[in-house]
Amino acid sequence: YGEDPKVETNKFAAICTHLEVCFMYSDFHFIDERNESIIVESGDPNALLKHRFEIIEGRDRTMAWTVVNSICNTTGVEKPKFLPDLYDYKENRFIEIGVTRREVHIYYLEKANKIKSEKTHIHIFSFTGEEMATKADYILDEESRARIKTRLFTIRQEMASRGLWDSFRQSERGEETIEERFEINGTMRRLADQSLPPNFSSLENFRAYVDGFEPNGCIEGKLSQMSKEVNARIEPFLKTTPRPLRLPDGPPCSQRSKFLLMDALKLSIEDPSHEGEGIPLYDAIKCMKTFFGWKEPNIVKPHEKGINPNYLLAWKQVLAEIQDIENEEKIPKTKNMKKTGQLKWALGENMAPEKVDFEDCKDVSDLRQYNSDEPESRSLASWIQSEFNKACELTDSSWIELDEIGEDVAPIEHIASMRRNYFTAEVSHCRATEYIMKGVYINTALLNASCAAMDDFQLIPMISKCRTKEGRRKTNLYGFIIKGRSHLRNDTDVVNFVSMEFSLTDPRLEPHKWEKYCVLEIGDMLLRTAIGQVSRPMFLYVRTNGTSKIKMKWGMEMRRCLLQSLQQIESMIEAESSVKEKDMTKEFFESKSETWPIGESPKGVEEGSIGKVCRTLLAKSVFNSLYASPQLEGFSAESRRLLLIVQALGDNLEPGTFDLGGLYEAIEECLINDPWVLLNASWFNSFLTHALR
């Protein structure tokens, strides 16, 4: 199927081994003139002898099916759904040969399940000398089978002595069902014949043509095979060919994450041991009580489009209702806010048009979708690079325990757990890890409340937990969320929420970043600095936002980012190890001198320690989750194609392209207004500059 043997080495080895077993199965077996099976091992066999087995495996598919068809036509044997490996002229049946690195009976069942045919005989060999065959009929004599088993054992030892066996053994997948021949009849058959490309008379013709398509031939040849209409001139791709991506103009882009990142401020309690510890509302009230600088709130940066007094009233309402809770005998576990005018407005209550069943309105003559405006273009702003840099930094707390990146299911090999521990040590204090835990907490709490209290405006504290340098537990409060009505039937149905988050960042410094927020000043905080205590205004960033079941589900699984970046690091270690022919995990993490490429900036290729690489990869993965969007999906997929072409140029592979303009268009239509996509595009331009030097 056009796999590259240099890349898919295990698959290549499996294909070769299987082919060799098929050949050995057939070797020396003949049928004499009395139609008896005989074994002839010496030189030139008698001309009257006929080979007992027809070898089907190893031919190209068109030829193989031709052989199968002709056997079926001459013998009347039922035509198999999948290409078998051999045909036995003595027993008049097809044979499926299996060679497995797993248990023979498991593999046998998979094979039997796949081919679902009583007629085809199955014979499985393993590398450990076990075998299994249909109805325990092993067809061949002991000696022939022993030859095959010995050969397999030799291959295994040869592989093991070169350190290749473990990888080969583990790489075996279950049966793949590529070969199935669906018999298409009736209407479907007529439709299939009608929908063929021009110049094909029947489905069979077309299939034979597709099967004969050489996957690795030259592109021009392929194109000329396709159609007279395609005239793609292959243009050589040279250092001077590519141009930088065009980033959009317009006002600077604004913050669109579901919660504040570098600008967040926490109210914290250490060693929490209060009554009801671990109940979010109790924890939140305890955190609020640690701060004494509250003052009469006022608006310092209004939201352009919103009714700003409502945001102010919403915050005052939160303070008042928290006060009410404290006056009660017993603090409740959850708090539902009164449905005031300001909250109804902020949560879009009764704003959504009523949903009507399509049946009831399909006769409306001018039925149409809402007119929606094109998104407004935005330019790249410097704040998003600062956000990314911050996410790569170390904090003074640890946000995950050692076992946060799940245990392995299999008995864990020493190397894997060693890598995981090294990696965890590098990222446990990283700010991106704080964002993961914050995201998991918020999404879990919001999804929970959305299901448990559908009609209520529930108050949800934004909380995280960590450990200080001294190992003391700490509970942090970032602010609050108030959830709107949440009758979420479909994955994409939206629940609105208002977020209110503490911060020390003055919004007037980068007003464009805070376009979607109304910012209040709500207190003064005393901070210890080198010059003693200073008082700083404390701000509250308020905005309405929304999310859906599917987004919350992904948000709850943000820990996967740890796994993704760990796997990227592992592949770097694997590359090093295969060059040095020994496991390089320890050296990789403990070498203090070596620097690694981290990314591109206008200054050139940035380098850093291995820890910095881990944290940068993690931050990228986390930002892909925090700033997930269709623009990012499109940009990642399309820009990757340009990246591969540029890399091919760097590897002196003389790449050629057609319709490069179309590729640029596909990439640039994703560059609209998303801060993370714009930043990635500007990084991509830096990469282009340096790669084409």
UniProtKB/Swiss-Prot annotation:
EC number: 3.1.-.-
Domain of life: Viruses
Sequence motif Nuclear localization signal 1 (NLS1), location on chain: 101-116
Class in the EC hierarchy, top level: hydrolase
Positions of Mn(2+) 1 binding: 18, 85, 96-97
One annotated Gene Ontology cellular component of this protein: host cell nucleus
Gene3D superfamilies: Influenza RNA-dependent RNA polymerase subunit PA, endonuclease domain
List of residues binding Mn(2+) 2: 57, 85
Cystine pairings recorded for this chain: none
Residue ranges annotated as motif Nuclear localization signal 2 (NLS2): 161-224
Pfam families reported in the protein's UniProt record: Flu_PA
One annotated GO biological process: symbiont-mediated suppression of host mRNA transcription via inhibition of RNA polymerase II activity
Keyword terms of this UniProt record: Cap snatching, Endonuclease, Eukaryotic host gene expression shutoff by virus, Eukaryotic host transcription shutoff by virus, Host cytoplasm, Host gene expression shutoff by virus, Host nucleus, Host-virus interaction, Hydrolase, Inhibition of host RNA polymerase II by virus, Manganese, Metal-binding, Nuclease, Phosphoprotein
Intracellular or extracellular location(s): Host cytoplasm; Host nucleus
Cofactor note: Binds 2 manganese ions per subunit.
Subunit structure, as described in the record: Influenza RNA polymerase is composed of three subunits: PB1, PB2 and PA. Interacts (via C-terminus) with PB1 (via N-terminus).
Similarity comment text for this entry: Belongs to the influenza viruses PA family.
HAMAP family noted in UniProt: INFV_PA (MF_04063)
Main function: Plays an essential role in viral RNA transcription and replication by forming the heterotrimeric polymerase complex together with PB1 and PB2 subunits. The complex transcribes viral mRNAs by using a unique mechanism called cap-snatching. It consists in the hijacking and cleavage of host capped pre-mRNAs. These short capped RNAs are then used as primers for viral mRNAs. The PB2 subunit is responsible for the binding of the 5' cap of cellular pre-mRNAs which are subsequently cleaved after 10-13 nucleotides by the PA subunit that carries the endonuclease activity.
The protein's name in its UniProt record: Polymerase acidic protein
Lineage of producing organism: Viruses, Riboviria, Orthornavirae, Negarnaviricota, Polyploviricotina
